[in-house]
Amino acid sequence: MNCYFEEGETFTWIRDRDRKDKNLIISLRMLKEKHRSGNKQAMIAEDIRTGKKYFVKVLFCTDLEQVYVEKESKVQLYSPYVIRIYGGILDEKKRRFITLVEYIEENDLSDLVRTHGLAGSTWNEKMKVCHTIALKILYGIDHYMSMYWQDPIVHRDLKPENILASPDGETVKIIDFDWVHLHDSNVTVMLRREQKGTPGYADPRYWNSYICRKEMDIYSAGLVLYFLYTGRHHFYGNEELQRYMVGDDYAYELKDMPGIDEPLKRIIAKMIAREEERYGDIREVIADMEAYLKEIGRMPKLPELLREENTRDTIRFSYKVGDVKYSPYVKNYRFIPIEFGRKQERSQNGRMSGHILSFYRVGDEMRSVILQEDCHKIKEKERGRVREGDIYSYAGTEIEVLQIKKVR
């Protein structure tokens, strides 16, 4: 019998069970149940001390080890267009895995487009919002895919219901990484041979296979953009879905989009084409979308965007975690994740887990974003920038920046 949370119930969230520091413990009060079915539950909760709200996802499963390996709690990265996932803990006694997620008070794209409506009183105003939302979705995909160059993260369930957006397009967040393929994980490929994604949005070629490729998300994103610009699902009704599942030409041909410019249609058509004719990289999609929007004078300004123009220069970024030194090369926009409890961590401060800090490049500068609230910058040469000699501290381990050198 599953032990569901009830409204009003309290729960103590411990980020690291090996340490009992006060700032690692959050006392949560369950405010409202959002979903309950079978082995899943979703709640809105608040920090009793600060009042900060969180979204709590609960998964009940007999195979606790598999849940711990696979859960979306491992997808911890900073992006203005990807939901913040704070981490997950395993409640062995009640056989449930609990994931703490950023809480956003916005509708999903399906509800927004079909029920509440986009901001704007004219067609052009609504198209402006559509362009902004579309770009942010594409940038969000680029952000999680660019986390690792080899074997990138793949969402595998992109659809309108898994994107939160405000009516004006100011807020856009990709959510629900339940089906995610994690970097360097055979588990998410081999043990999840069952269907991946949602009928009508997942590439039918990979519907029931061991293969996991980033082109899967490009296909799904194309169908999401079709919905955004038309207000209709590309494949609708049992008959169309059955034809789509066959995986023949019908699944890869764009339907008509009345009122939409031909260049934009061509972009979306190439996103959902057969893989050999499809975009091979999300940045190719972004480049074509940006070129189209600049051509028509509709390129939105996104001040929070952490992406720069391509450059031939590379930055050699050296740092050490504890006594172990790392020297990755950083070109253009790329995250350097600092993780504990995985291959990278070699300190002797006990068992720790999670992605606690990211470094990234903007132009010729390196910057950082702290993802765990108990990670602190204890030595800083210049506020808001990363400089040689800067030191971060987490669980008694220091992360020191050794070198930032521009090379060609």
What residue ranges belong to the model's regions?
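Terminal C-lobe "cap" of eukaryotic-type protein kinase domains
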Residues: 274-277, 283-299
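Conserved activation segment of eukaryotic-like protein kinases, specifically the C-terminal portion
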Residues: 190-206
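Forkhead-associated
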Residues: 327-398, 403
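ATP-binding glycine-rich loop module of kinase domains
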Residues: 38-67
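Conserved end of the kinase activation segment
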Residues: 205-215
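Conserved short submotifs of the Hanks-type protein kinase catalytic core
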Residues: 94-108, 112
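Short beta-strand micro-motifs within the conserved protein kinase catalytic domain, predominantly
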Residues: 84-97
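Catalytic-loop of the protein kinase fold
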Residues: 145-166
